[in-house]
Amino acid sequence: MKNEVYNPSTMKRIKEIDLLKAIAIIAMVFIHVYDASPHLQPSSPIDAPFIWFIEFMGNIPSAGVFMLAMGWGAAFSSRSTPKTYISRLRQLVILGIVINFFEQYIPSIIDPATFGSVWEVAPSIIAVDIYFFAAFAMLYFAAMKGLRNKPVIAGGVSAAIVGVCFVVNAVFSFESFSTGNAWFDTFIGLFIRENNYSFFPFISWIVFPIIGYWAAILFKKATNRKSVMIFTIATGVAALVFSQVMMAVFGTSDAVVTGAHSALDGEYYSMSPLCAICGYGVIALEFVVANLIMMATKQRLAKCLGKMSKNVMEIYIAQWVLIGLLSPALVRVTNLWINLLIGIAVLFGSYYGAELYIWIRKRITESKAKRIDKSKAVAA
């Protein structure tokens, strides 16, 4: 393995993270399209392992990677201030509402007999999705930027948050509660696992952005690739072994290890302490695999997928717009391979839809800039 020198302070993007995010985007689209077809029936011997692979890649290797990369990016963002993150919080809440509109409301408007009336799904407008989680994570990043010159205090605050989250999740990981009020239950679900209203509750998942943030800070101190890989492999294997042993001792489901969907989905969505530790192990080894892929392809694959990684926000929104519009058809699909073909179409549609949106946004920005310059010239 080449022992090349790193200059982290000059790095704007880490290719391994870009590659992981791009793979996570692809897996994310396929799992969301797959989930939109609840009546799929295996029709060949290879269907079952293929379904397992889709479910596995669409869980911790996707959501966990996005959240870890979120923390990584915050640590490498030298220009951002606490105000920057508060502004992003507002933007992400608005985007979360828009996404929930397309994910929940559009199917009900198109086919209320299948998906329920708009009134019945109304609380879903604030349903937990990764954008709501990301919005609340901005509060943590704002605090870290405010404490950037006080690393000991910042580390203590981070450790305290992780400790509190682990304790809360240890108590509530395998429990659910409901008040009977869908609006209130959905709101509570933004922060803690609540019946069927939570997917990425803040207390359950904030550990991943925190790990990403501090991993990036440690990375900045690295001097060569070999030391980074050795540390990542060691901690990843240790996390997996520890979580496996503890699960064997306490008899918890191995669905936590694989990240696959099971009857105990709560173990994944509520992110129990063991699940979080195991999730870190999976992502750490993914990082090593991404490094090996880059070495084998001379970074060509990372360059090819780099644009997809940069446009993750736009692609995420575009895929939910398309899935929302296609939901009445997807819910009737029973063949896995038809679902897969639709997934491929949604992936390409999301990618090029995001590209079109970015192009339009760029042209509008340029047009506004020209008008401002022209106004200044006339005034002068």
Question: Model regions: which residues?
Answer:
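Alpha-helical transmembrane segments and their immediate juxtamembrane cytosolic regions
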Residues: M1-A380
